[in-house]
Amino acid sequence: MMKPLRQQNRQIISYIPRVEPAPPEHAIKMDAFRDVWILRGKYVAFVLMGESFQRSPAFSVPESAQRWANQVRQENEIAD
């Protein structure tokens, strides 16, 4: 007899970007990019959405982080 899989009725959690209050103190702002900060050797974008910041995943190149930020901004403009 096969063991039943545990937690069959567990709901699937979809990815929701974390809302950060602001870039942390130890993040270093990159002057060349509008939304990109250096965080632990990776590039992270913070985009202000209304009252709070949305934080991107960590990227290894700043251009990717900025592209993410631009996309989030565009999507938000469409949603409004």
Curated annotation (Swiss-Prot):
Keyword Cell cycle: yes
UniProt GO molecular function: DNA binding
Membrane-spanning residues: none
Keyword annotations of the record: Cell cycle, Cell division, DNA-binding
Any Gene Ontology biological process: cell division
Pfam families per UniProt: CedA
Family affiliation: Belongs to the CedA family.
Function: Activates the cell division inhibited by chromosomal DNA over-replication.
Full protein name: Cell division activator CedA
Annotated source species: Salmonella arizonae (strain ATCC BAA-731 / CDC346-86 / RSK2980)
